[in-house]
């Protein structure tokens, strides 16, 4: 044992003093101090439970004692009579055994592999004991869940990730998936439930037993987001539902996660075997699958971007050469060849690596290096987390904790330990880059010689620019030189370290080589400089632009085309990561993929960290909007598709925000009790305006109205129970808050809820009955116009059906033609007076006569006027398809419908492009003359001429 460094000697003295001051003073042995100086967690636990120290002396921890955990836990739970006692006993047992594991780890009486097995088996024992106790309790209350033949059905639990692989770290959370074999109903209880309801309640109680913070702490943070459909999916699924999901919708990343999946409890009953057999074809393909490499490379790229975004320096899990890269290397072989090589189907990493060596897939020395590095990093991770029983993989910056880790790892000081760490991580990175590697940086031809270098580093005259910019006139050259000199002066005022200056000196000649030959060199450079000033002190992003020449070209192309994009990149430089993959940059996601991509993105953020969740939502939105804008700029996306993508993106964000708000509310109050007897959440959101009409722009706000379906006498089922309708009101308020909170990444969306019944004077959330009553008896014509463009954007099917029926009933109401014309005209006149341009030489594309709003009002009038005789006119909420319906049902001539559609799409396209230029919707009065003439003629025909004349 190495002598303690000075920082730990002081710590030892403090610890001895604290134990001496106990009511029954304890003197510590030398080996006690050797452990206690490394871990505040162990010290604190033994001060609270001094008898545990006697136990450690009398029965020192043994490497294989994990085999007795279930027996010891069974004894600890023998007297438990209720759930409160269960929660207390589970927490106490976990702390006691964690102290023993930390003790054995510090004294190295257990190897690192022993420690990982102990941690994993402890978690499994606690999960299974809690499940079994709660299963019996639920059966007493609700009866035993049975299939159609009366056979009792169990709850099976898949442990995912490191838990599944038997490699859990010291302060890990646990990833679980719940399943049950067959549908059916409970038998023998006080009340009958179907199996889905029974197992959902059991699952909720199990999560609470493990995850809830009490006076005794918690057992494990439980993460259920790896289940099918994530947080928005059922908590528990039948085997058939699981099989359907993974066969029809399973994603690559879910396949990788399933490699380590293991049934908790080691059960060998026929249900367990059936579930394993069901999942196996999804995980391991019968053929050799080389598509895995690119998929894993994409996942690694996402993680690397996350490290940059969250500023994760010194991260031994996610950093280059860290634990995650060793896991990726191993998974490559499992997923490519596992279907044909049973030896590669191991869940644990080290045995899989050994099989890789035996099969000759990697040289033995590389496998030995990877195995050694893995054990080094896992011990370091466990020692780091054992300091305070906190889940972290970031190395400490303070001298005390650095000394603890160096001592625990067997090094004389932090410098020596860090050198060994660097060596291990470099060895891992070499193998990773060879096997998976990021796409090679495309540095391209080095332009830093000659005049481009002089342009940055020397004082040049205008004449010196001529060879570089022969296409520019003198005024343009002069302006270019002024811009460069101002930038150089601004940079000199910034605090840039030597490395930052070195990288900037490499970058600027390359940038000039791309910008100077452009005809718009001045515009491009002025926009790029705003970006450069925002990242000049952040060397990581400068290095990205130096190493990836293609990324630099994309930055120049996009900033030159759009000041909006340039402003976004300058404000949020993390978006530069999106430029590394041109294939995805100019091709936005499939519209149906936004929800799944966002779900995967949020999996990397702790579910209980609201601040990180808010940042992640905003960063995802900005990244996707950048891709949509890139597709728009390059004309890869037509105008209708731009709005479609922006709308699908907004719907994905709404879904995620409501999920986050729901989780927070349920954690605080429980859920409304009426939901136990039904599907869904009794909550829906109506999208109005541009969201409802699939017509969102880059800066559109969201017009939302919230609906609830909850009886009057319902309360929530949590410890802090509140009225059910109060729950939904607070839920809606929480949703509004999550959208509008300003973080370092800005707000998510501006949300306007004023279209709700009675506007700002009305309740934020309406019952579906109150909404129907208001629309039938109190709503103005303009509110019925708004209903034309309304649709459900979030909600359970039952509420959606009710809303659709109300909408159709209102829109199909018989209306007198001339009165409707007058009311629509009057509303339009009010809007024009309020919003329209007052200048005769200006045309506001949105608000002025002959513009987009006139077209929208024509569409709304036609639906309100003719849906009574042709209800199918209410089918769509967007203007383009409304005009299509009008032509199909012979209400409007086909040529007129096509002309109005063309005018509408043309103007919308211009508004998108003006937004990319950060310009308003006001243009010269000469613009869109033909379109405005068509709109004016249609306006007169439908809204001015007597209805009988039409």
UniProtKB/Swiss-Prot annotation:
BP-aspect Gene Ontology terms: regulation of glutamine family amino acid metabolic process
Keyword Transmembrane part of the UniProt annotation: no
Cofactor: Mg(2+)
EC number(s) per entry: 2.7.7.89, 2.7.7.42
UniProt-annotated stretches for the region Adenylyl removase: 1-440
Pfam families: GlnD_UR_UTase, GlnE
Gene3D superfamilies: 1.20.120.1510, Beta Polymerase, domain 2 (3.30.460.10), Glutamine synthase adenylyltransferase GlnE (1.10.4050.10), Nucleotidyltransferases domain 2 (1.20.120.330)
Keywords associated with the record: ATP-binding, Magnesium, Multifunctional enzyme, Nucleotide-binding, Nucleotidyltransferase, Transferase
Adenylyl transferase, as annotated region: 449-950
Enzyme class label: transferase
Listed InterPro entries: GlnE (IPR023057), GlnE_rpt_dom (IPR005190), NT_sf (IPR043519), PII_UdlTrfase/GS_AdlTrfase (IPR013546)
A molecular function GO annotation: [glutamate-ammonia-ligase] adenylyltransferase activity
Function: Involved in the regulation of glutamine synthetase GlnA, a key enzyme in the process to assimilate ammonia. When cellular nitrogen levels are high, the C-terminal adenylyl transferase (AT) inactivates GlnA by covalent transfer of an adenylyl group from ATP to specific tyrosine residue of GlnA, thus reducing its activity. Conversely, when nitrogen levels are low, the N-terminal adenylyl removase (AR) activates GlnA by removing the adenylyl group by phosphorolysis, increasing its activity.
Annotated HAMAP family: GlnE
Protein name according to UniProt: Bifunctional glutamine synthetase adenylyltransferase/adenylyl-removing enzyme
